[in-house]
């Protein structure tokens, strides 16, 4: 009974988020949900890691491991095992979900790979950077990235929560493994990464989001 109530609440929350749509946000969140626009930010973060750490290769390999674990657990194991239909494929929600540009995603949605991968990256790099501003920026990005999936109607809130759990677990496992295999790759000081490099990451990330918002404003404003 409680489980069914939770599922119904999950549907109601999804419809509330997805239902608050506008032409501006349709394009905005469609672009936010994509991966290409985040390449500059990812490259800058990798550049800062390589520039700062002598054992950068180990750190990068651990990042790849964290994301790979999150992706495989969510997509290859959990989705087919749980087999929960995405909102866009759920017969009981037919005609209720706002679909953007015909995008409906794959058949199953629990857990969200976007949420798993983004939070794996966010948590692992936060543990490496050990900087509060960076943590706010990167987790803000992960939340925005994950929210876009609900706005587009391809994931329920519980899909996102499950993805966050898988992603954070993967990041912790990768971090502990790195700490055991190559302890010197783990920064011991909060000042290992220069503040100017954190600001550089912030500028690139905010320009990416701001550029999309500004472009949409001129299109729909």
Where are the regions a protein language model picked out?
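N-terminal transmembrane-helix/juxtamembrane module of multi-pass inner/ER membrane proteins
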Residues: 1-40, 74-102, 221
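Membrane-helix interfacial "entry" motifs
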Residues: 19-27, 51-60, 151-156, 189-193
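Hydrophobic alpha-helical transmembrane segments
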Residues: 32-49, 61, 114-117, 137
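Hydrophobic transmembrane alpha-helices of multi-pass, membrane-embedded glycosylation machinery
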Residues: 44-50, 143, 165
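Membrane-water interface at transmembrane helix exits
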Residues: 46-50, 70, 74-83, 126, ...
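Interfacial segments of alpha-helical transmembrane regions
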Residues: 46-73, 135-136
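Hydrophobic, lipid-facing residues on alpha-helical transmembrane segments of integral membrane proteins
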Residues: 61-73, 77, 81, 165-173, ...
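Membrane-embedded catalytic cores of phosphoryl/pyrophosphoryl-handling enzymes
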Residues: 98-221
């Amino acid at each position: 009974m409680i489980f069914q109530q939770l599922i119904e609440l999950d549907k109601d929350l999804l419809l509330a988020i997805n239902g608050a749509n506008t032409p501006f946000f349709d394009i905005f969140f469609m672009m936010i949900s994509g991966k290409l626009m985040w390449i500059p930010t990812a490259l800058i973060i990798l550049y800062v890691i390589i520039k700062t750490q002598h054992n950068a290769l180990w750190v990068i390999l651990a990042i790849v491991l964290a994301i790979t674990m999150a992706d495989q657990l969510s997509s290859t194991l959990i989705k087919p095992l749980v087999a929960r239909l995405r909102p866009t494929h759920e017969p009981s929600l037919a005609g209720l979900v706002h679909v953007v540009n015909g995008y409906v995603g794959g058949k199953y949605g629990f857990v969200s790979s976007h949420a798993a991968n983004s939070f794996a990256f966010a948590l692992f790099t936060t543990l490496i950077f050990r900087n509060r501003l960076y943590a706010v920026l990167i987790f803000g990005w992960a939340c925005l990235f994950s929210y876009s999936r609900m706005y587009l109607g391809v994931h329920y809130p519980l899909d996102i929560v499950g993805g966050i759990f898988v992603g954070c677990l993967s990041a912790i496992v990768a971090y502990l493994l790195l700490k055991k295999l190559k302890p010197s790759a783990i920064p011991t000081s909060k000042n290992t990464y220069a503040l100017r490099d954190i600001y550089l990451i912030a500028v690139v990330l905010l320009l990416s989001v701001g550029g999309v918002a500004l472009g949409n404003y001129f299109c729909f404003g």
